[in-house]
Amino acid sequence: MALNLEKKQEIIKAFATKENDTGSCEVQVALLNERIKLLTEHLKANPKDHSSRLGLLKLVAQRRNLLKYIKRTNHARYVVLIEKLGIKDR
């Protein structure tokens, strides 16, 4: 259920703004987005797993806050990021 190392490195490489960039907002949002996708699939198969549902809600809130920060500071980066991730603009 968790992201493996290869998948994480692939996401970091795709969304990094410079070399060795693992903590920028874009990378964090991309990693959260992948974890949210995995948890969503898990919850479809296990609808009574309420602790995972709470974890999913926390991840979604964290992603929302990071996206809000990116939108506030650099709108152009925000637009590119949501297009790459396939997230709807709110």
Swiss-Prot record:
Cite the SUPFAM superfamilies for this sequence.
Answer: S15/NS1 RNA-binding domain
Substitution effect: residue 19 to Q: In strain: ATCC 43504
Q: Name one GO cellular component term.
A: cytosolic small ribosomal subunit
PROSITE patterns in the record = RIBOSOMAL_S15 (PS00362)
User: Which Pfam family, an example, fits this chain?
Assistant: Ribosomal_S15
Q: Name one GO biological process term.
A: translation
Q: Which Gene3D superfamilies match?
A: 6.10.250.3130, S15/NS1, RNA-binding
Protein keywords: Ribonucleoprotein, Ribosomal protein, RNA-binding, rRNA-binding
Would the keyword RNA-binding turn up in this protein's UniProt record? yes
Q: Name one GO molecular function term.
A: rRNA binding
**Quaternary assembly:** Part of the 30S ribosomal subunit. Forms a bridge to the 50S subunit in the 70S ribosome, contacting the 23S rRNA.
What family does the database annotate?
A: Belongs to the universal ribosomal protein uS15 family.
What function is annotated for this protein? One of the primary rRNA binding proteins, it binds directly to 16S rRNA where it helps nucleate assembly of the platform of the 30S subunit by binding and bridging several RNA helices of the 16S rRNA. Forms an intersubunit bridge (bridge B4) with the 23S rRNA of the 50S subunit in the ribosome.
Protein's name in the database: Small ribosomal subunit protein uS15
Q: Which organism is it from?
A: Helicobacter pylori (strain ATCC 700392 / 26695)
